[in-house]
Amino acid sequence: MKILLLKCGDICYDGVVIMLRNILKYMDKTGMEIWLYANGRVADREIADEFSNMGIILVTGGQDGLDDEKTSADIRRLCRAERFDIVHCNTGNNRFSGIALMAARAGGNAVRIAHSHNTNGADKTYSAKANVFRRINRELAHVHLACSASAADHLFGAGCKHIIIRNGIDTAHFKYDEKIRNEIRSALGIPDDTILIGNIGKMINQKNQEFLLNVMSVLKKRQIASRLMILGEGALREMLELQISSLGLMDEVLLPGNIDDIAPYLNAMDVFAMPSVFEGLPVAAVEAQAAGLPVILSDVISRETDLTGNVTFLSLAEGCEKWADSILEASKRKREDTSIRVLEKGFDIRHTASVLRKMYIKIYDKRKGRIK
């Protein structure tokens, strides 16, 4: 069975890449030849090597943005040359998904899967064409998958029949451990009486981390002992560093960069905050809940993200003062082991990988005429 996975953008530490990495890590790949095409570049060699070490054949388009013609040509060429059985497009970008599905159809007769990972696209220039691409995604995909109901509505339009694929994690690995918490906080120089606010995500406009810096400025003015730690890298790092300097937050903000194993750092945090301007069902928020953290999310994020009852949704329009209030309130909650709640909601990565493998096999067997 030959499978082509597609994703928009670079091979980097973003949500889709991490989700694919985790699924493939835990999937039984016996009898499968899996390719991964990204229309961007290899931005993080370490995670690219992880795919290669799992036997995944990695192909990149070398684009800095979304070049429709080149993306289409790349996918058509791959499909014609390799004759894939399944083409599985993973994105929250309507435009990329539509282009990819049209190219896959032109390039062969593979079964086409469209998988929505977001509730909105970052490219506002093409927002007027969203309904056109939704129709393309709905009609050209044989199988419609999504991480949440709102993500499905975004990519396919309301009312389209779809299957939910949970953004699973290794719940046992993220279980809260006070010993690890103390070790990491000591290594970071975080005193016991200091609130450590955490955020994980690529430094791009979508993640809206500049908003958190303004929240930190509010906390500093209130003389609240607090720190902010943002895990990740991205194009906006320099801008964030300038903002940190202009707000006088050099001693309050930590930017460790990309961290392969974030579980120990989640243990060290007191509150997890994600003021994104759009998301699907973010893996980082699932991981934070498995680690027992109270979570503050912008209200554009799917309510399906609340797995533990310890999630607060706030509008960005409520402003930094309100966000600061909510963070302070959340930091007073007793830390508990909530990993089992996340597991019980079906967000275990082993289950996710098993569900997807069974789906691939069923599609392949039906394609080969083994089942009706």
Predicted regions and their residues:
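Aromatic "clamp/platform" in nucleotide-sugar-dependent glycosyltransferases that forms part
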Residues: 258, 277
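A charged, aromatic-enriched C-terminal amphipathic alpha-helix characteristic of glycosyltransferases
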Residues: 173, 334-371
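Donor nucleotide-sugar binding/catalytic pocket of nucleotide-sugar-dependent glycosyltransferases
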Residues: 140-179, 313
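Short hydrophobic beta-strand element within catalytic cores of glycosyltransferases
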Residues: 285, 294-298, 303
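A short helix/loop element that forms part of the nucleotide-sugar donor recognition site in Leloir-type
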Residues: 175-190
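Nucleotide-activated donor-binding/catalytic signature segment of Leloir-type glycosyltransferases, i.e.
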Residues: 241-257
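A conserved mid-protein helix/loop that constitutes part of the nucleotide-sugar donor-binding site
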Residues: 14-22, 195, 199-218, 235-241
